[in-house]
Amino acid sequence: MTVSRNLAAFAALNGALAVLIGAFAAHGAGPQIKTLLTTGGHYQMVHAVLALVCAIWPGRGRLVLWAGWLSATGGLVFCLALSAVALLRLTAMGAIAPIGGGLMIAAWLLLLIAALRSQSTPA
């Protein structure tokens, strides 16, 4: 099995950041800040795991690799935008969150296309 080392490393970094943000949210954040950080951290963690799966996907093609990069990047952009709103009160950064969301949606759609194009193999 081949592994995309760079994608796996980026996914791992995203996972670590998601845990850090979740820990910060759990310890000492007010209710509104906690909600924003928890939401961002959740999406970042889910998409870090998806990116890691894409990095180690057996027989992965370009669509799966692209899905991994879009997933990790989208999760990071979404989470950082919500964190900037919550922690720095940069409300204008809230406008960037949908870009991250769009990247995450694109990642899932690329995986859908990859799955539909794949050949079935007997178990």
What annotation goes with each model-predicted range?
Residues 1-123:
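Polytopic transmembrane helical bundles with strong interfacial aromatic enrichment
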